[in-house]
Amino acid sequence: MEKGITKPSILVVADDFTGANDAGVSLAQVGHTVDVAFEMPYRGDASVWVINSDSRAMDPKLAAMKITSLMSHLPLANNPPLVIKKIDSTLRGNIGAEIEALMKACGIT
C-alpha cells in the first residue's frame, strides 16, 4: 500500500489481531485516523499505525526478533512517533521480551 504519509504520530505494537484492532478502535473513537498493518514495510496515510506482530504464541527470543525486525522498517529518527506496546488483558504473550526489543529499537536502554 503506497500512500502519502510514511510516518505516524503514534505507533502501537500488538501481538495479535484482536489486540491490534482493540487498540485501533479505541484510538479511532477519540478522533485519530488509524491503519492496522500486518506486515512491514508499511506506508499509510493514518496518524496512528497499529502493527500486529502476530507473536503471542512464539518463543520469547523469536518474538523479540520479530519486534526488532518490524521496528527496523519504521522511521524512528528525527521526531519519532509515540510508541505503545499493547498488552493482553490477561497478560498472555511475551510481554517482557517484546518491551525490551521495543525499547532497544527506540534507543532506550
Where are these regions (language model features)?
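Non-transmembrane, aqueous-exposed alpha-helical and coiled segments at domain scale
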Residues: 2-109
